[in-house]
Structure formats: structure tokens, C-alpha cells
Amino acid sequence: MQEHLVVTLDGKDYLVEPGTNLLEFIKSQDTFVPSICYNESMGPIQTCDTCTVEIDGKIERSCSTVIDRPMTVNTVNNDVKDAQKEALDRILEKHMLYCTVCDYNNGDCEIHNTMDAWGLQHQTYEYKEKPYEKDYGPFYRYDPNQCILCGRCVEACQDIEVNETIRIDWDREHPRVIWDNDVPINESSCVSCGQCATVCPCNAMMEVNMEGNAGYMTDTEPGSLAAMIDLTKKAEPGYGPLFAISDSEAEMRKERIKKTKTVCTYCGVGCSFEVWTKDREILKVQPSHDSPANKIATCVKGKFSWGHINSDQRLTKPLVRKNGEFHEVEWDEALNVIADNFTAIKEKHGPDALSFISSSKATNEESYLMQKLARQVIGTNNVDNCSRYCQAPATKGLFRTVGHGGDSGSIEDLEKAAMSVLIGTNTAEAHPVIASRMKRAQKLFGQKIHVFDIRKHEMAERADRFYQPKPGTDLAWLSAVTKYIIDHDLHDKAFIDEWVDDFDEYYKSLETFTMAFAEEATGIPESELIKFAEECAKAESVVICWAMGITQQDIGSDSSTAISNLLLVTGNYRRPGTGAYPLRGHNNVQGCSDMGSMPDKITGYQSIEADDIRAKFEKEYGVKLNPKAGKDNHEMVEGIHDGEVHSLYLYGEDTGIVDSNINFVQAAFEKLDFMVVQDEFLTFTATYADVVLPASPSLEKDGTFTNTERRIQRLYQALEPLGDSKPDWKIFQAIANRLGFDWNYKHPSEIMDEVARLTPLYAGVSYDRLEGFNSLQWPVQPDGTDEPILYLEGFNFDNGKAKLFPLSFDNYFKQDEIYDIHVNNGRLLEHFHEGNMTYQTPMIKYKVPRAFVEISPELAEDRGIHEGAEVKLISETGEAVLQVHVTDRVKGKEIYIPLNNDAMENGDLGAINLLTNSDVDQYTDTPSYKRTSCRLEVITKRGKSPLNPNNFRVNKKRQPQYSVQVQKKWERSDYVFPGNQVDK
């Protein structure tokens, strides 16, 4: 087999691998060829024609040429230069050069840079204004008069994000980008991911925050300076002086526009990007091809929802309650109050009378210090985090079967899989960038997507097959499918023999899991389950993703175990494109648990009850550690009611809204002797506190986050803390020192060094190795070697073998006669969790102003209600009043309530957890949020819709197509390929 081909480039021979993109090869040799429509994250689009070169004597586009034979390539002869100039002239016919007064003149305008690098001095075709106005959406705007029709935005929308909203109407006299069937941006199905603005090579598609703000002389139009620009063009011998002026102005901008690499503070995907700031103003968020988790993709929150950073509701001074009212105080007083109360409670009731809840929004280093504060300084293991509310059952299931509590591969593997199975995950709204990778794999590469969910969300709509089991019955069909695969000799016997223990015992436990049993339990027809089982067994590679629809059940641990059992039986571990993916909900919920903010585990999931583990930490900490596992979140609340817990310190967590059965939780808060809350805002939970400490968000500190794929990434401080707020790690250090300890960390890197010394899972992690966009996926060996795919050398048990885990099922779903409606709940794309951060961005709030309840058309008809009706939902634990959105995303007596009730403005009004109960998964104490029933009372029969009429949910209008459909451009009567004009 031929390994390399000879390519002669401008007279010099090179050995090149077959399949290499010619344009990429030319660039790799530091040879300049213009390529305005090409983007390395998207590949060839073929609209601009600027990348023409001569290949074996013929002028062709280099961007779409694959090196599949020996070639002679010329980039410099006259014919090539003439063809390139013709293409560049056509671009300037569509785009006015007013660089010095353009907000996009920041050194990265690809039109400016290309014209300058090519040496263009004059344009042949005069710029022609088009008969269109600018179109403004909430977050970005489109200027048709600057658009060169490169189609990058279309490619991004159609084939990268796969939101399928944007296209080019090539049939017009003056083609332009349109949204849906030619409606304004704000009336379209656009989900505001912002990737169109990210990839635009010029100022045609641009973030609203950039407009009029980026340059020294910019305004929203060229304005009065346009005449000067035209005069300069005519007076100067070429464009060189004009570019020199704009380059100087762009260089000046660097003095006031700061570009800082950070990691998104919302979901668990772990998107990284540069945030552009001018003073405290956030101009834009710019992802990079080097971003390891997301590449150039973002969602509306990561790209645009940064209003919380400069919100006027930010806490800037400590608050201490005096005579029932909060008063601003200096840090010294607040720290004294905390130290005095912690000391008094510990002396009176013992260390286990104090409890600590860590934040999945904070950094790894801060989570580590929170548990260190609890264990070293106070002497208790009463420390936990919000993985208790969502992901603990998934971790339990994976610990049982494969030994590591994390995704078994990378996000890339989700794209490589032949089959993706989504169970109880609203991926397109909870993890939108991951969903885009899977939608792309399905659309372009034939991946099969199977969705099991009680709600018809976007991924269910797009699925090759969609199954709607009864609530909480996934374990039944998972085990029945596994049994069928084994019974019909479809299991991977070789894989099981080499890599899996306990097969015989496990197989016996499957005896009752017949397909008939599964159909009765789940309501999914036996024939559909059989077909799924056969496809799953025969697929070359399978990944299974799951989230809160599985974990937030009273059998969440067992259902998660059943998922891993199925993957083991089919041999879908230890290979690219396979494995288990419990999609983590928060930006650092994985890392928070990794750092030991758990009652029974210290860093890296080392048992606090193990003598050798405690001895290691005791040597580092200089104190004896409590050998008894502490209380988890659920047990803390119970302990408060039982008089065992007297103090609670929590940060970055609105527990009084997000815990289940919040009437019970709030009643517990009122019983506490002393409560400390640390947050950006005076949250609903903070209103119960005795001391509230002002904390700094992610843009105001350094640190690391660990995402859902176990990827550890650095974030860099972009802004100074607002007012007297402080990073959480500095606050913990101040409290520890006020209590008599001598913590002396100067920078979070020192904290991570300590973690690495104590934690085999993070042994080789250091800030040097995480510089810039570099990342590591744990476990990380001391030499820095990481594991993007787990278990290649064996599973995380002593003998290297996985374990099949026997299960049973008696969790039939039965609807209560009185509480006859099943309440489902979860996230929305625009908001995160309770919405404390996202509601601070006005345009996010404009898109989704309040929480609501989704009701099926059949239930609405049965109760005689319509869109906008107001209803009261009543469960055994509480009641909530919400407005109705009628939609076929839910069916029958299933309803869906988003989590975002804007608690800072509305308190607990409309909060889903007024309805949830205190039932939990028996192995992890994770609340059974998804196992809630209620009855419905009608307050008003109709009203104003709770959704903005322009919200994409109201009227889906997607316009799917493949890429930019450049052939329609080529078919136009006014188009001639530039190469044809110079070919002889």
C-alpha cells in the first residue's frame, strides 16, 4: 500500500499522505493562498473562489481538492494570481472596506487580512449596496450590505450546530442570508447559539455587544468618516496606506480589549473560549478550533449569558443579620461572626453538628478547600455537593460495574459511534453542544439515534426511533433487552470471557426479564424492543448517554447499573465510539466530587473510612481525621430536623429552591442555630442565612473545571472581583486562618499541586500542563499521561475485569387516583437550573421570562383550558401556580415543568420542588424528583402565553439542507468560475 504521494508545490517536491486536504497542505508549508470561505473547523464550502491554484495545469479550488494522486501545484504564476484577484474583486464588490471605523477591525478580519497579505491595491468592481436593512436579533445582527455570501454561517447552522435555521436564498436578484422562510432573526427558529457570528470572516454577522463598542472611532455606520475613506481610496496610490492606518488602529485596540481564555460556567460540556472585555464590559465570547470539548461551538448561555457578571444585584459586601435585618459589614467583622459561631457550636455539640455543602459551579481548587475546611479545621465529614441531586446514582452504577465514576470516553466518541442511545436526557437543551455533535453525526455520517424518554424533546423528534416508556421503568426494558441479546446468542462472548466477571450469576438474575414482562412494565411494544435489541447487538459501536431522567428516580442507581450491564454484554467498552456517558449537569459537578466534597470519599474517590487513606491526609493536614462517614445533603436536612445538625455553610448552591420537598428544607433552615451562605447574589436560600458572603464568579478568578468527559481545563481571571467580593478559595482560607490554622496559598495552582500529591486520579495534573487550551482527562499519571478512553488496559478493579451486577425490578408505575397527573421536570436551553445567573441577562429573560408548565393537547381539552391558562398544581407536599403552555412534547397526563422559576425575583413561587417529595434512591439518597404526582385545579382557562411569541418552541420552522448548496450559486447566469476566465 502506498504510504505517501509526491506533490510538487511551486517547484519543490514533498511527500504527502493520501487524503490530505490540498489547502491545508499548502498552508502547512507557510505558503500563502487566500481562503476566505474556508475554516479549518468546517472544511471546504467553495463559495469564495479565492483559494484557486493551478493543479496539473488547470485552475481549481484548493480547498475542495484532496490529494489522491501525485500532483504538480502552482500558487504563484500569472494565471493563478489573475484568478485569485478576480475572486477578491468580487468580494469587494459586496463588502465596503471601512476598516478603521469597523468594530471588526481587531486583527482578525479575514477580508482585511487577506486583501493586505495578497497585496491588493485597487478593486476592479465598485462596491454595490444591496437593497436590504440590517436585521437585529437579541444577541447578534446581520448586515447584508457587508455580507460576502461565503456561507460559513450557513455551514455552521446547518451542519455543525445542526439547528437548521440559516440558509442563503440564491434565487434572488441580490442573494442574501435568510432565516427560515425569510423572516426576521427574532421571529425565526434560531436558538441563538451564536456560531454564525463566531465563524463570520468579517462584520456581516456580529455580536450586538460589539457594535459601536470595539474601536476608537467606531459607530454603528461608517457615518461621516465614509467620505474620508472613499477620498483616501482615490487619493492614495493603493490600499496599502489605508490598511496601514486600520492596522495601527487595530493595534491600539489591544491596549483596552483584553482577551482571556476561560471555561463556560454553565453545563457539564466544558466549552472553552476567549472572552473579550473592555474595562468590565463583555464584548464577545470567541471559541477556538483549539477548544478541546466544543471546538467552535457554543450555546446561547455560553456565548451570550454573561449578564450576571456586572449585574446590579451582585453582592459586593458581606452581610450580617442583626435584629432580623441584613447589614453590610467589613470582612473582618463577618469572619469574626463566623469563627465565633463555628467555635461555639463545635464546643457545645461536637464537630458533626456543623455541615458543609460545596458548589458544582466553583473551581476544583475551591471544592477541595471546602472539604479541607470541613475535615481539617472543623473535624467533620459532613460535606457534600449537588451531585447528590443528580449524578450520584450514575456514579454508583459505574462503580459497581466498571470501577470509575465518569464518562468512559470523550465527546469525540459520541460522534464516532454507529449508534447513540439517549435515555432520560434532554440533550439538545441540557447539553446542546454535545447534542450538536450527535445531530451532525446522524445527518452527515449516518449515525443511528435511539431515544427513550417520556417527553418528545428535540432529540426525540430527530431520532431514528423514539420510545416512550412509562415513568421510572427503564430498568425493565434495559434488562429485558440484555436478556434477549444473550438468549439469542447476540452477546459478545469473546469480550465477556476476557474482560467480564460474574456472567453466570448475572444471567440467572435476568430470568424474569422477558420481553412480555418489559412490555407490561414499560408500555413499549415487545416488537419494538426486539428490533432495538437486535440493532444494538449488531451495531459496530454503541454509546449510551443518560441524565436526570434516569438518575432522579428511586431506582436511579439500579437503572444506571442496567445501562452499564447492557454495554458490557455487547462489548461496548474499551473502544473508540463506545461506552457509558452519564452527562454531568453542571460545569464542575464532576470535579466537585473528584475533589472529595463527599461525606464518605476524599479526593479521587478515596474512602475516608480507610485507615491508609486517612493516614496520608493526616500527614498532609497535620491533624487526626474523623474516621466516620458524614452526612450527605439529604441527611443534613434530616439531621437539622432531628436536632443533630446546628450549623450549615453552603456556597454557590440555592438549596432552598433546588432540593426536593423545599417546604421541608426551608423549615429546616429556620431551625438552624447558624447559617452561612456564600454566593454572587442574595439568593432565595441566602435570605435564611445569618451571614452572607460575596463571592466572585468564574471570570473573576483563576482555577480549573472538570467536565463531563473527565477533562480538566484551566480558566484565567479576566476581571477584578466586583466591589469587596472575593474568590471562594480566598474566603475559605480566611475562615480557616481565623479559626487558628495557617493556610498560605498564594494562587490556585498551589492548591492543585497539593491535590496532585494526594490524589492518584490527578497525580500528573499541573497548571503548566494545562496552559492555554491544553487539557487532561483523568486518570492522569505522574508523567502527565492521561486517558481519553478509559479501560484500555483493563477495568478499575484489582483483576482488571468488569463486573456484571444482578438486578431486580418491582417499580411499576401506577397513577394515583387523586394525584392523577405525573410531573416531569428539567432544564430549558436558555436558562440554567433555577436561573439565578441566566435571568441577569435581559435578552435571555426576554426569550423565556418565567417558568411555566407544559400540558398536552389532550389534557388541555379534557380540562377545558388553553394556552396561557393559569393552573394550580397540588401534590402531597405542596402546591405551585403556573401558566400553561400547550404542546405535543408531552402526552396524556404527563406534564413538564422547567426548573427556572427566577427565585431571586419570585422566591419559591412556581418552583417545581414545592411539589416534589422526600423519596430518595436507596443507595445514594438522590431525590426522586421525577417520581412526582399532582392534581390540577384550573384558575383561569386562558391567558397570555408564558413564552415570548418569538420563542423557537412556539412555532418550529426548521429548514434543513446540506451545507450552503453552493451549486445553486454556480448555476446562476451571472456566475463564472474565475479560473475559467484565465484558462487557455
UniProtKB/Swiss-Prot annotation:
Residues that coordinate or bind [4Fe-4S] cluster 4: 264, 267, 271, 299
Protein species of origin: Staphylococcus aureus (strain USA300)
The protein's required cofactors: [2Fe-2S] cluster; [4Fe-4S] cluster; Mo-bis(molybdopterin guanine dinucleotide)
Cofactor-binding details, from the entry: Binds 1 [2Fe-2S] cluster. Binds 4 [4Fe-4S] clusters.
Reactions it catalyzes: formate + NAD(+) = CO2 + NADH
Domain 2Fe-2S ferredoxin-type: 3-79
Binding site for [4Fe-4S] cluster 3: 157, 190, 193, 196
Residues where [4Fe-4S] cluster 1 binds: 95, 99, 102, 109
One Gene Ontology term, aspect cellular component: membrane
Domain 4Fe-4S ferredoxin-type: 138-165, 181-211
Top-level taxonomic group: Bacteria
Domain spans labelled 4Fe-4S Mo/W bis-MGD-type: 257-313
Enzyme Commission code(s) on record: 1.17.1.9
Family statement: In the C-terminal section; belongs to the prokaryotic molybdopterin-containing oxidoreductase family.
Domain 4Fe-4S His(Cys)3-ligated-type: 79-119
Protein name in UniProt: Putative formate dehydrogenase SAUSA300_2258
Record-level Gene Ontology MF annotations: 2 iron, 2 sulfur cluster binding; 4 iron, 4 sulfur cluster binding; formate dehydrogenase (NAD+) activity; metal ion binding; molybdopterin cofactor binding; NADH dehydrogenase activity
Principal EC category: oxidoreductase
Keyword terms: 2Fe-2S, 4Fe-4S, Iron, Iron-sulfur, Metal-binding, Molybdenum, NAD, Oxidoreductase, Repeat
Chain residue ranges for the region called Formate dehydrogenase: 252-984
PANTHER family: FORMATE DEHYDROGENASE H, RESPIRATORY NITRATE REDUCTASE
Residues annotated for [2Fe-2S] cluster binding in this entry: 37, 48, 51, 63
